[in-house]
């Protein structure tokens, strides 16, 4: 019997999840159908519950419903609890389970690039939900210190305070985007600057070996500056594929290989 999956969001037209999951299915022999599902901004819960009531096997959640999905889950993975957002849902024994695979997607993408994560010092630009979701997996993968830089320093400080309890083994620090300096192994752009076209200027006194842009398929002043410095760089398509593979493997107990889809 064909398993039914979906990705839910608003907007949803831009999602590449169906093509990825159908490609994974073809590679692994899983019989599935995966659809885009547009939910009204005030209609996420009813749309999601209707999908599972009709026999849906699993659902991905995208903007702007990840925090709402988190709040509705009966059972959460540890990384979802820390992220306070859920992008992967499934029903098990009548209970709604939730996970957040974004951080693992980022880790898998970085590892596929053969950038070392062990004992690294990482700078993340931005202190929103995208950053919160990746801290724990980065630490699990070996990152030694993570510095979070944000335009509003108080927001970065709040995030660090929240995460210090959840991820006590990590060295976490908050700074202002105006105070970017020092040496880092990897800089990750998790700000919406690339999406909105706001140019984020990286000062000369900020040094880094690698640059990762979470967004993909759009012009990025962040990556332009990495190119000018001749620093190895990548955009977020690998992260997208990585998080999709993680969700696929949770639902289907088979894991496609990331390298086959990059």
From Swiss-Prot:
Catalytic activity: shikimate + NADP(+) = 3-dehydroshikimate + NADPH + H(+)
Pathway as given in its UniProt record: Metabolic intermediate biosynthesis; chorismate biosynthesis; chorismate from D-erythrose 4-phosphate and phosphoenolpyruvate: step 4/7
Keywords of this entry: Amino-acid biosynthesis, Aromatic amino acid biosynthesis, NADP, Oxidoreductase
A single cellular component GO annotation: cytosol
UniProt GO BP: amino acid biosynthetic process; aromatic amino acid family biosynthetic process; chorismate biosynthetic process; shikimate metabolic process
Catalytic machinery residues: 66
SUPFAM superfamilies cross-referenced by the UniProt entry: Aminoacid dehydrogenase-like, N-terminal domain, NAD(P)-binding Rossmann-fold domains
Gene Ontology molecular function: any one: shikimate 3-dehydrogenase (NADP+) activity
Family of the protein in this entry: Belongs to the shikimate dehydrogenase family.
Protein name (record): Shikimate dehydrogenase (NADP(+))
Organism in which the protein naturally occurs: Acinetobacter baumannii (strain ACICU)
Classification lineage: Bacteria, Pseudomonadati, Pseudomonadota, Gammaproteobacteria, Moraxellales
């Amino acid at each position: 019997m064909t398993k039914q999956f979906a990705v839910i969001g608003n907007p949803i037209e831009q999602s590449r999840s169906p093509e990825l999951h159908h490609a994974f299915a073809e590679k692994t022999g899983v019989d599935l159908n995966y659809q885009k599902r547009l939910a009204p901004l005030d209609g996420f819960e009813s749309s999601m519950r209707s999908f599972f009531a009709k026999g849906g096997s699993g659902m991905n959640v995208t903007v702007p419903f990840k925090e709402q999905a988190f709040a509705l889950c009966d059972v959460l993975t540890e990384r979802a609890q820390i992220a306070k957002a859920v992008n992967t849902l499934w029903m098990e024994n009548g209970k709604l389970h939730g996970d957040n695979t974004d951080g693992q997607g980022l880790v898998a993408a970085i590892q596929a690039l053969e950038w070392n994560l062990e004992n690294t010092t990482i700078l993340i630009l931005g202190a929103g939900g995208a950053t919160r979701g990746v801290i724990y997996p980065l630490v699990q993968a070996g990152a030694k210190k993570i510095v979070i830089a944000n335009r509003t320093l108080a927001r970065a400080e709040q995030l660090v305070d929240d995460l210090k309890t959840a991820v006590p083994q990590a060295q976490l620090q908050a700074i202002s985007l105006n105070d970017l300096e020092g040496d880092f192994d990897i800089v990750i752009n998790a700000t919406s600057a690339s999406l909105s076209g706001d140019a984020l200027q990286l000062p000369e006194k900020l040094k880094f070996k690698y640059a990762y842009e979470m967004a993909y398929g759009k012009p990025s002043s962040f990556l332009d500056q990495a190119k000018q410095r001749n620093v190895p760089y990548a955009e977020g398509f690998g992260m997208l594929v990585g998080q999709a593979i993680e969700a696929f493997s949770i639902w289907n107990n088979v894991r496609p290989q990331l390298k086959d889809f990059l």
